């Protein structure tokens, strides 16, 4: 799994509202890690497609208190 800190720094928009992590090999563990990151509270759109995050990864994102502003999530 890639370094989550580096990915957030490189892939989060300047306004903190869009996170594009398409095809970054995150898997379930990466999705769970993202779901704990307080610095992502302003994210409104996130692309996690082609990451193989699985059911548990999706559950972690869905139940996360971090992503309260999330309105658009791509998992395809």
Which residues does each predicted region cover?
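Short secondary-structure capping/turn segments at boundaries of alpha-helices and beta-strands
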Residues: 7-8, 33-35
């Amino acid at each position: 799994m890639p370094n989550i800190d580096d990915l957030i720094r490189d892939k989060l928009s300047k306004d903190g509202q869009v996170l594009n992590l398409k095809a970054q090999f995150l898997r379930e563990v990466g999705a769970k890690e993202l779901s704990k990151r307080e610095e992502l509270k302003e994210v409104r759109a996130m692309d996690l497609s082609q990451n193989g995050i699985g059911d548990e990864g999706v559950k972690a994102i869905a139940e996360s208190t971090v992503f309260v502003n999330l309105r658009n999530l791509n998992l395809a």
